[in-house]
Amino acid sequence: MIITIGGLAGTGTTTVARILSERMGIPCVSAGDVFRQMAAERELDILEFSRIAEENPEIDIEIDRRQARLADEHEDLILEGRLSAHFARADLKVLLIAPFDVRAQRISVRESKDIETVREEIRIRERSEAQRYREIHGIDVDDLEVYDIVINTNRFDAEAS
């Protein structure tokens, strides 16, 4: 079974993907894993590669291609990433959501950052990503039609999600 798990930062995608992987006994690959692999292939650290990726849409496109290829090569796999459901063949496509303030609080705790700083960073990142995804892929991130299930993780802790 191929499962994609997507969602905005702070919704719990990485945590849920990891827990599902452990409980189902199937591998999990995140878009972040693919990004780190691509940086290593170029012998760049993550920060350097991130700067390059901001200016080069081909990097986003390659991440999507690699995740789609992984889905084609495996019978059982969990793919975690914001756009995984749009590009990978999957039996189940899940979107996790949570209110803005809940996500900001989770990220603030996780990264030990001031909540107001996190809120501003989220706003900037989400505007930037929405624009990039629309320009590069023609994807409207607010269109949920591609997903089979949408789960609000607001009331769940990591294990319950």
Swiss-Prot record:
<dbReference type="GO" id="GO:0005524">
    <property type="term" value="F:ATP binding"/>
</dbReference>
<comment type="similarity">
    <text>Belongs to the cytidylate kinase family. Type 2 subfamily.</text>
</comment>
<dbReference type="InterPro" id="IPR027417">
    <property type="entry name" value="P-loop_NTPase"/>
</dbReference>
<keyword id="KW-0418">Kinase</keyword>
<keyword id="KW-0963">Cytoplasm</keyword>
<dbReference type="GO" id="GO:0005737">
    <property type="term" value="C:cytoplasm"/>
</dbReference>
<dbReference type="GO" id="GO:0006220">
    <property type="term" value="P:pyrimidine nucleotide metabolic process"/>
</dbReference>
<dbReference type="InterPro" id="IPR011994">
    <property type="entry name" value="Cytidylate_kinase_dom"/>
</dbReference>
<dbReference type="InterPro" id="IPR011892">
    <property type="entry name" value="Cyt_kin_arch"/>
</dbReference>
<keyword id="KW-0547">Nucleotide-binding</keyword>
<dbReference type="Pfam" id="PF13189">
    <property type="entry name" value="Cytidylate_kin2"/>
</dbReference>
<feature type="binding site">
    <location>
        <begin position="7"/>
        <end position="15"/>
    </location>
    <ligand>
        <name>ATP</name>
    </ligand>
</feature>
<dbReference type="GO" id="GO:0036430">
    <property type="term" value="F:CMP kinase activity"/>
</dbReference>
<dbReference type="GO" id="GO:0036431">
    <property type="term" value="F:dCMP kinase activity"/>
</dbReference>
<keyword id="KW-0808">Transferase</keyword>
<protein>
    <recommendedName>
        <fullName>Cytidylate kinase</fullName>
        <ecNumber>2.7.4.25</ecNumber>
    </recommendedName>
</protein>
<keyword id="KW-0067">ATP-binding</keyword>
